[in-house]
Structures are given as structure tokens and as C-alpha cells.
Design a protein with these regions (language model features):
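Switch/coupling subdomain of P-loop NTPase systems
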Residues: 89, 96, 100-103, 108-136, ...
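Flexible beta-alpha connector loops of hexameric P-loop NTPases
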Residues: 77-84, 118-133, 152-158, 212, ...
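Conserved G1/Walker A P-loop phosphate-binding module
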Residues: 1-112, 123, 142-143, 148
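C-terminal-of-GTPase-core extension/linker across diverse P-loop GTPases
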Residues: 2-8, 13, 19, 147-354, ...
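Amphipathic alpha-helical transducer elements in NTP-driven molecular machines
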Residues: 35, 49-52, 65-71, 85-98, ...
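Glycine-rich, flexible loop/turn motifs
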Residues: 26-34, 41-43, 51-54, 83, ...
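Conserved nucleotide-binding/hydrolysis micro-motifs of P-loop NTPases
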Residues: 25, 51-52, 75-78, 106-112, ...
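Short, glycine/charged-enriched secondary-structure capping and boundary segments
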Residues: 22, 84-87, 116-119, 218-221, ...
């Protein structure tokens, strides 16, 4: 699994159209009225990576298995969702479990598609979404205080630390600032994450533009990109309409259509790349006659923990990792050539896995 991304947005911004296109399914009932996504839709998509195909060809692998990305499509939020208006409130618990939140913002003009606020303003839309998520976080934290207070009076040291984090986060939220702006030390990071705050999650702005703006964006998406840069958030320009059309085509037709539009790749690729960047994820590979497979870990993951992604026994019995950088593996024609050229390294438990490493783990049964 690459990462789990919750998709949120106001009604009629193209959110479910995008979800359907990305997952190549019509599971969401797209229609021009609010709340057409009645239940959270969950879709898995393979992460496209040309490196995997190259490895499979060299290793003569019978099968290629990409890592996967999980999208959770949440019903359209409206102003007041955190107070139970619309259908937004019941879905907040669902998006607490995701790694990042994609704000789908309407960056196109179309008189035939109504905007719930009666205007096209992606910055205002982003602020509406953020406000509802902040209000939900406020409610969640305020409800924790009585229990934490009782535990603190009982000399519970962990509760005292948690209460300090809660109070610090509440100060920010009451000032209209998201929890991700909180100053958190390395020791506090795990406890802060356990608060499961919506506004502490990384944000990826998805600018849904018209077809003519898919390559370079437009004035609306430019404003969003400026905001994203100021916040350190991710930003990607996508035309949900184009993505929906691409989803219906064969690989060859898709390639021709992209060339005709002047687009180097589908929007999904850009979305995944931004997500990886935002979450600090990397991919390593395993390759052999049976299969070539991609695995996703966070930057800074050491070899035993990377092995544990395959199976917990690999981590428990880890001895060492046979390691070949991707470029060397390809240039030297695979494991045998890399070994002969002295490019295969034996790495121990302190080795930090790098993006593109081709690994074979040795472990004790």
C-alpha cells in the first residue's frame, strides 16, 4: 500500500467524477446535486512506475505487482457540516484514518453546473473545507479535556503530556489556524499523531480545471498554487473530465489522446507523485522469476523494517539485505551482472533504504 488519501470537496466540484476516473469505476453516483456520494467510496489503484516494468523484463518475471494507493471519497461537505448539517458530519470519522487529505477545488467555469455557494472561488472553497475540519477538531479536543483532567489529578504523567498537546492545539484552532501549524517536538510526535486531528494531516490541493487548462492551469489554479506554496502543501492540476475520458480508453488510445492534448501523462501519475512527496514515501523493489514487485516505505526506513513490510518474519529474523541500486540493476542487466561488477552490496540492520533499491532479504527462520 502506498498511502491512503481522503478526498473532500464541496458539492459539484467534480470530486466524485475524479474519484471514478482514478479508480476506473462508476461506484459513486455522480449527479448535479449535493450529497450524491451517500456512502464513503473506497477505491484501490495501482501506482504506475515504469521502473517496475523494466525490472520485470530483465528478471524475466512471470508477474508484476505494483504497490497500491487507496482513495476514500467522502460525501460533499457544506458550510455547517461539523454541526451535523448536510451529510458531512457522519463522514469525519472516516477521514480521520487517512494519511493525507486531498481538497478537490473547482477551478473551472461552467454555467450548466451549479456551485453550492453560487460562485467559482477555489480559495474560498478551501477555506470553507478547512473551517469545517477545524471545527470538527475543536469539538474532538474539547471533549477530551474532562477525562484528561481527571487523569492528571490522579498523577498520570502521560495524560499531563497529552493535555498540554491538546491545549496547545486548541489555541491554534481557536485562532482559525490548522493543527498542522503546531510546534511539536520529536518526543511529542507520536502522541500528537494519536490525537488524530483532521487539520494535522498533510494537505494536497487538487485543482479541477477545464480541458483547455489541463496542461498549464488557469488563473484559478494559479491562486491555489500560490496558497499551497505558502503553506508547504502539495498542489496538482487535473481535469476530471479528461481523466474520466482516459479511464474509458485502451492503453494505446490513452497514449494517443494524451499526445493530442499535449499532456505528458495522466493526472493520476501527478497525483501520486505529489502524494509521495507530501508524505515522504519511497519505493523499493524485489525482482525474480516469479514476480517483480514494488513496496512502499517512508523515507528513513531501515532495512529490517522495510523487510517487515513483506512479512513480519523477515523483520524478526533479519540478517542482511542484498542491495542493488535500480540504475545499476538496469545498466548491468540484472542481479548477476551487478554482482560481477561489484555493485551488489550486503547491508546490515542500520542500512537506510533508498528509493529505487532492488533488495533481497536474508533472514533466519
Amino acid at each position: 500500500m502506498g498511502f491512503k488519501c481522503g478526498i473532500v470537496g464541496l458539492p459539484n466540484v467534480g470530486k466524485s467524477t475524479l474519484f471514478n476516473a482514478l479508480t476506473e469505476t462508476a461506484a459513486a453516483a455522480t449527479a448535479n446535486y449535493p450529497f450524491c456520494t451517500i456512502e464513503p467510496n473506497v477505491g484501490e489503484v495501482p501506482v504506475p512506475d515504469t521502473r517496475l516494468d523494466a525490472l520485470a523484463k530483465i528478471a524475466k518475471s512471470a508477474e508484476t505487482i505494483p504497490t497500491r494507493l487507496l482513495f476514500v471519497d467522502i460525501a460533499g461537505l457544506v458550510r455547517g457540516a461539523s454541526k451535523g448539517e448536510g451529510l458531512g458530519n457522519q463522514f469525519l470519522a472516516v477521514i480521520r484514518e487517512v494519511d493525507a487529505i486531498a481538497y478537490v477545488l473547482r477551478c473551472f467555469e461552467d454555467d450548466d453546473i451549479n456551485h453550492v455557494e453560487g460562485r467559482v472561488d477555489p480559495i474560498a472553497d478551501a477555506e470553507t473545507i478547512e473551517t469545517e475540519l477545524m471545527l470538527a477538531d475543536l469539538d474532538s479536543l474539547e471533549k477530551r479535556i474532562p477525562t484528561l483532567d481527571r487523569r492528571v489529578r490522579g498523577q498520570d504523567k502521560e495524560a499531563k503530556k497529552t493535555l498540554e498537546l491538546v491545549e496547545r492545539s486548541l489555541v491554534l484552532l481557536r485562532e482559525g489556524k490548522p493543527a498542522r501549524m503546531a510546534q511539536v517536538s520529536d518526543e511529542e510526535r507520536a502522541s500528537f499523531k494519536a490525537l488524530n486531528l483532521l487539520t494535522a494531516k498533510p494537505v494536497l490541493y487538487v485543482c479541477n480545471v477545464d480541458e483547455d487548462s489541463a496542461a498549464a492551469g488557469n488563473a484559478h489554479s494559479a491562486r491555489v498554487a500560490e496558497r499551497a506554496e505558502a503553506e508547504g502543501a502539495g498542489c496538482v492540476i487535473i481535469s476530471a473530465k479528461i481523466e474520466a475520458e482516459l479511464a474509458e480508453l485502451s492503453p494505446d488510445e490513452r497514449k494517443a489522446y494524451l499526445a493530442e492534448l499535449g499532456l505528458p501523462e495522466p493526472g493520476l501519475n501527478r497525483l501520486i507523485r505529489e502524494g509521495y512527496k507530501l508524505l515522504g514515501l519511497i519505493t523499493y523493489f524485489t525482482a525474480g522469476p516469479k514476480e517483480a514487485r514494488a513496496w512502499t516505505v517512508t523515507e528513513g526506513t531501515r532495512a529490517p523494517q522495510a523487510a517487515g513490510v513483506i512479512h513480519t518474519d523477515f523483520e524478526k529474523g533479519f540478517i542482511r539485505a542484498e542491495t542493488i541500486p535500480y540504475d545499476d540493476y538496469v545498466a548491468l542487466g540484472g542481479e548477476s551482472g551487478a554482482r560481477d561488477a561489484g555493485k551488489l552490496r550486503l547491508e546490515g540492520k542500520d542500512y537506510v533504504v533508498k528509493d529505487g533499491d532492488v533488495l533481497h532479504f536474508r533472514f533466519a527462520n
